[in-house]
Regions:
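N-terminal "domain-start" segment that seeds a small globular fold
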Residues: 23-55, 80
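Short loop/turn microsegments at loop-to-beta-strand junctions
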Residues: 39-40, 62, 160-162
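Structural microenvironment flanking redox-active thiols in thiol-disulfide oxidoreductases
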Residues: 79-141
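Sec-dependent N-terminal signal peptides
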Residues: 2-13
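Short active-site neighborhood of thiol/selenol oxidoreductases, capturing the structured segment around
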Residues: 54-82
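Structural micro-motif
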Residues: 128, 139, 143-152, 156-164
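Bacterial Sec-dependent signal peptides at the C-terminal "C-region" and cleavage site
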Residues: 11-27
Length: 197
């Protein structure tokens, strides 16, 4: 009986001394995201007709995705979702976080067309860059980011969706396949990278 009582006292004391164990619930306590690879560099033309390079955004967390304005299937899902995340990021967006949407249809997506597209989805333009460029450069860049794109016989473009999050040092840290990923997880991953130095 004394042995059992002593054992209970030891266990209770150990539990009390160890304190409550907290389960991580936010981005500040989650495991660091893996380092996938250096992000492919680019210099393209923005919706304002100005050159923008990935290197210009060094020091920010950058989400890079590929879209085109005439897409009527999946791009209209991805861009509004990113707009929602833009709003949820609040004051971090633009100062510490940037979005880059690169057209895979540069023949039709001129800077003026991209500007209208950005306005249609409520993009916060100082922090969200819609980019176009020469066809071979865009196609090579898409391939290096892991995005497949090909023009179909009817002139439409079939393409895969892969959104990459690049850290402040230009390293891809996470990639989302498709367009139906959780916007809150996307936001948390961005916040996690913001907390890194």
């Amino acid at each position: 009986m004394r042995t059992a009582l002593a054992l209970v006292v030891v266990v209770v004391t150990a539990l009390m001394l160890s304190g409550p164990r907290e389960i991580p619930s936010d981005a500040s306590q989650q495991e660091p995201l893996p380092k996938i690879a250096p992000a492919p560099q680019f210099t393209l033309t923005s919706q304002d007709g100005k050159p923008i390079a990935l290197a210009d955004l060094r020091g920010k967390v950058v989400a890079v995705t590929f879209i085109f304005t005439l897409c009527n299937a999946t791009c209209p899902v991805l861009t509004p979702m990113m707009s929602l995340v833009q709003d949820r990021l609040g004051r971090d967006f633009g100062t510490d976080v940037a979005f880059v949407s690169i057209t895979i249809d540069p023949e039709r997506d001129t800077p003026e067309t991209l500007k209208l597209y950005a306005q249609m989805y409520g993009a916060d333009v100082p922090g969200w860059h819609f980019l176009t460029g020469e066809v071979p450069i865009i196609h090579d860049l898409a391939r290096r980011y892991g995005v497949f794109a090909a023009k179909s016989a009817d002139g439409d473009i079939d393409h895969s969706f892969l959104t990459s999050i690049v850290d402040r040092h230009g390293i891809i840290r996470v990639q989302y396949l498709g367009v139906r990923f959780d916007p809150e997880e996307f936001r948390r991953d961005i916040l996690s990278l913001l907390r890194e130095r």
